[in-house]
Amino acid sequence: MKKGRFLLRLGAVVALLVTFSLTGIEAMGVVKQPVASGEPRADIIMIDSLKAFGKLEEVPVAFFHDQHTDALKKQGKDCTACHETEKDRLSTKFKRLKDVDMGSVKETYHANCIGCHKEMRSAGQEAGPTDVSCRSCHSRDVKASSNWKAINMDKSLHYRHTASDSIPKGGQEANCAACHHKFDEQTKKLIPAPGEEGSCSYCHKAEVIKDVKNIRNASHIACVNCHVNVAAQKADTGPLTCQGCHSAEMQGKIKVVKDVPRLKRNQPDAVLLTVADTKALTLDSKSLMQPVAFNHKAHELANDNCRACHHESLASCAAECHTVSGDKKGGFVTLEQAMHKPGSQSSCVGCHNERKAAKDCAGCHALIPEGRTSEASCASCHAEGIKLDTVQIKAMSKEDKTAMASAMIEARMPAGTFNISDLPEKVVIADLKDRYEGAEFPHRKIVETMYAKVAKSELASAFHTSKGTFCQGCHHNSPASENPPRCASCHGKNFDATKNARPGLKAAFHQQCIGCHTAMELEKPAATACADCHKERK
């Protein structure tokens, strides 16, 4: 251990257990930001366990977990060198199962860490500090920087776990039960939850709540124990080091399954979204929203995990948290806000806006003012012609709603665009000939190229509701027509402050064309290469 003087007295004894850490172990926190210049590492754990008893007297100790793991491995030792077992699972705490008091916890670290270092030194091996100088371990001078990165259990990684034959019992149902459970009030034990599986974070939060472990400890206990047990059977398993899970380099080497089979857990293919909070509605409700046919199956394919929408539980948004008027369970976020808030990644509109920011879509959408809505855009989701009052909503069964949603989704037809051959092949923009000749715009080629990028997008198909919708990316504020008016019919030669600060014709052309090129990350023509579009006049 060449950097022994900077290793904490926690010593060479902490084993593999923390290796799958999502955020750290027990009261120790993984450093998420660089703590100093030097070698980047994903295994820097700041040991600050004593803060549970009050203000720390010394700065936390920076502990390089993987470096100690390697040292233990050379000695033929494993996780049990540092971690005791509880109910056949290794505890995340160092050399103890419970924190009794500050003195005993402090003594546990000092005695075992320094003791281990002394043993190694006596055996002629390199080791960490063995003296009693506090600054040998409690130092602000950490010769490393953190490159720790959270790991995401996406669909591919989840599928590899459910389909794995390496998990002790094997088979999908058994594999699910290895991680997913619920608390049985009668037996006061954790039991499997077939058909009710949800994200771990639905129950395990960032902090400990009553007797429920936080997500940090729950993840380490479940994941690391499984990896260690599978590795002991000489079978393929997940990472056994912090670096293996939490460095960007190693995450980039994780095998990705491209076509992940749909995981069927009794979820619906289609959902009819209505105002479920019928208690807040009266028979004469004037603002009752029209139903939305939600393609649940398509959204599963478009997202890495269920938490993209179900961020607290698998129950429907309106039934569980978000009511018409707002409720404490939903953070007082109303149903309308949960669905429509533009800047939220958890709302429908916010998520769609994020997808529209992709370069294939941004050429048009980056130039459309946020928040612009119309009856046509609302009708993309809220079905026209289907009027349901409060009485009808209350009378509909779950099966009726599913059938109606499925029929509405089936009836949706992609609008496409106008016949390409009917569009002008070229358009010469010559309104402002001065120093340069008019710009020859390859209209048909550009339409074909841009449309090909979104033609297979289900999101685009759902919201491009007429053949002219696609054209309105350029021909904005105009009727969706095969023959839209010329730009000069709205944009005068000069800036007009009296008409919503409408830019002049020259500015409008450059803003539209260069703005689109920039949003789509096109290198040519460059914004400053005037002659690439306009031939200079002789």
Regions found by a protein language model. Name each.
Residues 2-12:
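Bacterial N-terminal signal peptides that target proteins for export
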Residues 81-84, 131, 135-136, 178, ...:
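Iron-sulfur cluster-binding cysteine motifs and their immediate structural context
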Residues 139-144, 247-253, 324-327, 369-370, ...:
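Short Cys/His-rich micro-motifs in 6-15 aa windows
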Residues 222-249, 354-396, 530-536:
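Repeat-solenoid scaffold signature
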Residues 113, 132-138, 198-200, 223, ...:
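Cysteine-rich micro-motifs
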Residues 29-126, 143-194, 201-231, 255-311, ...:
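Sequence context of c-type cytochrome heme-c attachment sites
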Residues 11-23:
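Bacterial N-terminal signal peptides
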Residues 119-128, 139, 231-232, 369-370, ...:
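Short, exposed beta-strand-loop hairpins at the edges of beta-sheets
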